[in-house]
Structure formats: structure tokens, C-alpha cells
Curated annotation (Swiss-Prot):
NCBIfam families named in the record: adnlytase_SelO, PRK00029.1
Known catalytic reactions: L-seryl-[protein] + ATP = 3-O-(5'-adenylyl)-L-seryl-[protein] + diphosphate; L-threonyl-[protein] + ATP = 3-O-(5'-adenylyl)-L-threonyl-[protein] + diphosphate; L-tyrosyl-[protein] + ATP = O-(5'-adenylyl)-L-tyrosyl-[protein] + diphosphate; L-histidyl-[protein] + UTP = N(tele)-(5'-uridylyl)-L-histidyl-[protein] + diphosphate
InterPro entries tied to this protein: adnlytase_SelO (IPR054838), SelO (IPR003846)
Protein name per the record: Protein nucleotidyltransferase YdiU
Residues holding ATP: 84, 86-87, 107, 119-120, 170, 177, 256
Record's function text: Nucleotidyltransferase involved in the post-translational modification of proteins. It can catalyze the addition of adenosine monophosphate (AMP) or uridine monophosphate (UMP) to a protein, resulting in modifications known as AMPylation and UMPylation.
Organism of provenance: Shigella boydii serotype 4 (strain Sb227)
Length: 478
């Protein structure tokens, strides 16, 4: 089957990119590819059998027209000016059978006009982390970019030490970022901001294109998508680590996996990025930061959208987030209905977990073992303060009995929303260290395991982290 590519970005937004081709690595070789995703995108298996090829920037497929995008943004709350694709190149937009498109974005593809002081490269460590994280999030049901392939090489890339240069093929319906809009707003080119909005509406919100109120309705949906995404992050214990405006997806996708981390111990103020000295992007601050970023996006639209309309959309953020979050957290607790005491029970559990540094994922997963008419619970052994747990658990069982459903029904609900497996940093690190020694088996094993996060397992993928794997330091270095 021949793949078809279109050039919408190149044709319709001529001042938002620089056309250029990837710079190949030395002795590039394909070490992993996403068979399931490739099948979904109707990519012939033969493309993965002819060396690095397009996956390593050594060839282009017919119809591809590579370019690097320019955008700007606020980083750690401070205006950073022009940024852009410093090491990534959009190879093309694949046209799918249903008329939608999928960006093919090659990360680590070499120098671009937007590399600033960088070298345009990515290292094997960061490409493995992003591939694992994006696929883990996908199978958790959270909107995200996807990973299609990883190429390693003999080209050294210098970070803290010399590391193998690598490339990641990332795919997504769009790489539109808040930062695209900021770029032209701060250059006082509001008409180009409008062109970006029209482009987004035309291709991703086409049902609004002929509506006279399209900009307000569109921005309201961007707010809702963002609120929903953040609610989902919070419920699975995911910390992004670098929520700069240039890393915010207009479509509400999880974008740009860098120093991310999933909670091990329940620590509301968890900071996964060791460069985040002030804790701006801590786990519990993510909802507020996302709203702040939406406010920056709203500012760029103010020359052609009524400020009252923008503020009305922004005002809806909190309620949308709380609605999604509350619904999912009730499911995580096994509640089939909504009752007035639900929030208090959840907050009391969180307080107990925070005091005892309980494992976030294991605690919620073990709730499925609760029998509503039994005072015994395997979860009790997870807590030191048994009296405090017993007090909470008695009220929790009483709440379960209000729903009048069987233990098996409730267990099925809890296990469908509380994963047994999340991508803990130590699991990723183990796969990385093996891969850097030339052993790709753990990378493939872990990818396969992450496809079934809600299935029970009896291996160390679902255990607490070993001592060496606790609080691994992760930075923006990639």
C-alpha cells in the first residue's frame, strides 16, 4: 500500500517554518518499532526492513516535504522569546483513509534554524523514555502523542557525558502548540494569529468553520480539552515536569515528554524535574499552571475575540476539571453513584497516604480487594497507623454499601480505572541501561507490558521501586 502525504502546514502557513531535511546519524539502526501503531496507520512492514531509512532521516517517502516549525513561549513563567523545533523536523502529514491526518515528526533530526545553542540531536536515553511514556499514556487512555520508532547510532552526543545519538519518530494528529500563537502575538502580527486559529478550526474543528461565533466556541473547547487532560494526569499520578506554554498541545494531547514522572509514594508536592527549583511544575500545581497557560493563549486571541468571551471560557476551566477529576476519582474508589461524603472520604485517604508515603498506584489498585461486608482488608498492611486506617476504612465500607452493587461489579470497575502498572522511572531506567549496552530485550518487554496496564501481574513491574530506583533525578537534558 502506498502512503499518502499532504502539505497543509507548508501550503497554508508559509511564515511558520523553515524547509529543511534531516541530517542522518552514523551507522543508524532501527532498534524498536511500534507494530500495532504501524498497522493502524497502514504502514507497510517492508519499511522497517530496509535499514534506518526514513526512521533515521536517511530517506524521505514520496509526498513528504520536511520542515522545522517556529514558535515561542513562556518557560517557567518567564517569556523566553523565539524557540521552535530545535532538533525536530516535521517530515510530512500522512493522509489517512478517514480523511484525517497524522504528523510524522522526527526528533533528533539535526540542526535547524531554531536550535539556538543546541546540537539538534537527541540521545538514546531520552528517545526511549519518550517512547515508553507516550505508549504508556495511550494504553492508560490518556490523550497523547505516539511513538512509532527508535533509531540508535554510533554518533556520540554530549550531554553530562557522551551518549549514543538517536532519533524518535513521533506521530500526532497535530503539533499545534500554544507557543505558535504566542510567537506572532508578541511580534504584533495578530492577523497571523488569526490565520493560525483559522487553520486549526478548518482542519480540527471543521464543524465550527461556518459558525459566526467560531472563535469563542473553539477556544472554549481548547479550554475543556486542556482541563480534561490535566484531570486525567492527576488521577493516574502523572507529573509532566516542564509545562511551558510551548509544550502545551492545542488539541489537548500530552506533548513533549522530558523529565516526567509517575508518583511512587503519594507526595502532593512531588517535583520530577530537578531543574525546577521553585516547584512551579510540581504535581499538585499542574492544574493551576495549565490555567495560567490557557490565559496566555487567550491573550494572543484578544485582538479578534471579545475579552468577555475569552474570560467566560477561562472561567469554565475549574468546573470542567473538577467534574472530570471527581468522576474518575469516584470510579477509582469504586463508587457507582455520587454522594455528598465522597470528597471528604477521598481527602481523608489522601491525607493518610501523604503522612505514610503510601504507594499511589498500589494503594488504589488494592482497593479492589475490599469486601464491603468484611472489616478485613489486605490494604491495612500497607499502613503503619492502623487505627487511622481502620477509622477511614469503616466509613469507606459504609459508603460502598450505599451503592447496592456486588463486590465483583465494584472490583471490575476499580480494576478498569486503577492500573496495576505505570511507567515508574526505575523501570524506564533499567530498560535504558540495558539498551545502552546493546541489549534491547528489556525495552521490548517493557513496551509489551505497558500495553496492558490494567491486568494483574506477579512480576517486579508492579512492585514498589527498589532503593536505587527511588527519586531518580531527571532533567530536561535530552
Amino acid at each position: 500500500m502506498t502512503l499518502s502525504f499532504v502539505t497543509r502546514w507548508r501550503d497554508e502557513l508559509p511564515e511558520t517554518y523553515t524547509a529543511l531535511s534531516p541530517t542522518p546519524l552514523n551507522n543508524a539502526r532501527l532498534i524498536w518499532h511500534n507494530i500495532e501503531l504501524a498497522n493502524t496507520l497502514s504502514i507497510p512492514s517492508s519499511l522497517f526492513k530496509n535499514g534506518a531509512g526514513v526512521w533515521g532521516g536517511e530517506a524521505l517517502l514520496p509526498g513528504m516535504s520536511p520542515l522545522a516549525q517556529v514558535y515561542s513561549g513562556h518557560q517557567f513563567g518567564v517569556w523566553a522569546g523565539q524557540l521552535g523545533d530545535g532538533r525536530g523536523i516535521l517530515l510530512g502529514e500522512q493522509l489517512l483513509a478517514d480523511g484525517t491526518t497524522m504528523d510524522w515528526h522526527l526528533k533528533g533530526a539535526g540542526l535547524t534554524p531554531y536550535s539556538r545553542m543546541g546540537d539538534g540531536r537527541a540521545v538514546l536515553r531520552s528517545t526511549i523514555r519518550e517512547s515508553l511514556a507516550s505508549e504508556a499514556m495511550h494504553y492508560l487512555g490518556i490523550p497523547t502523542t505516539r511513538a512509532l520508532s527508535i533509531v540508535t547510532s554510533d554518533s556520540p552526543v554530549y550531554r553530562e557525558t557522551a551518549e549514543p545519538g538517536a532519533m524518535l519518530m513521533r506521530v500526532a494528529p497535530s503539533h499545534l502548540r500554544f507557543g505558535h500563537f504566542e510567537h506572532f502575538y508578541y511580534r504584533r502580527e495578530s492577523e497571523k494569529v488569526r490565520q493560525l486559529a483559522d487553520f486549526a478550526i478548518r482542519h480540527y474543528w471543521s464543524h465550527l468553520e461556518d459558525d459566526e461565533d467560531k472563535y469563542r466556541l473553539w477556544f472554549s473547547d481548547v479550554v475543556a480539552r486542556t482541563a480534561s487532560l490535566i484531570a486525567q494526569w492527576q488521577t493516574v499520578g502523572f507529573a509532566h515536569g516542564v509545562m511551558n506554554t510551548d509544550n502545551m498541545s492545542l488539541l489537548g494531547l500530552t506533548l513533549d515528554y522530558g523529565p516526567f514522572g509517575f508518583l511512587d509514594d503519594y507526595e502532593p508536592g512531588f517535583i520530577c524535574n530537578h531543574s525546577d527549583h521553585q516547584g512551579r511544575y510540581s504535581f499538585d500545581n499542574q492544574p493551576a499552571v495549565a490555567l495560567w497557560n490557557l490565559q496566555r493563549l487567550a491573550q494572543t486571541l484578544s485582538p479578534f475575540v471579545a475579552v468577555d468571551a475569552l474570560n467566560e471560557a477561562l472561567d469554565s476551566y475549574q468546573q470542567v476539571l473538577l467534574t472530570h477529576y471527581g468522576q474518575r476519582m469516584r470510579q477509582k474508589l469504586g463508587f457507582m453513584t455520587e454522594q455528598k461524603e465522597d470528597n471528604a472520604l477521598l481527602n481523608e485517604l489522601f491525607s493518610l497516604m501523604a503522612r505514610e508515603r503510601s504507594d499511589y498506584t498500589r494503594t488504589f489498585r488494592m482497593l479492589s480487594l475490599t469486601e464491603q461486608h468484611s472489616a478485613a482488608s489486605p490494604l491495612r498492611d500497607e499502613f503503619i497507623d492502623r487505627a487511622a486506617f481502620d477509622d477511614w476504612f469503616a466509613r469507606y465500607r459504609g459508603r460502598l454499601q450505599q451503592d447496592e452493587v456486588s463486590d465483583s461489579e465494584r472490583q471490575q470497575l476499580i480494576q478498569s480505572v486503577n492500573p496495576a502498572l505505570v511507567l515508574r522511572n526505575w523501570l524506564a531506567q533499567r530498560a535504558i541501561e540495558a539498551a545502552e549496552k546493546g541489549d534491547m530485550m528489556e525495552l521490548h518487554r517493557l513496551h509489551e507490558a505497558l500495553r496492558n496496564p490494567f491486568s494483574d501481574r506477579d512480576d517486579d513491574y508492579v512492585s514498589r521501586p527498589p532503593d536505587w530506583g527511588k527519586r531518580l533525578e531527571v532533567s530536561c537534558s535530552s
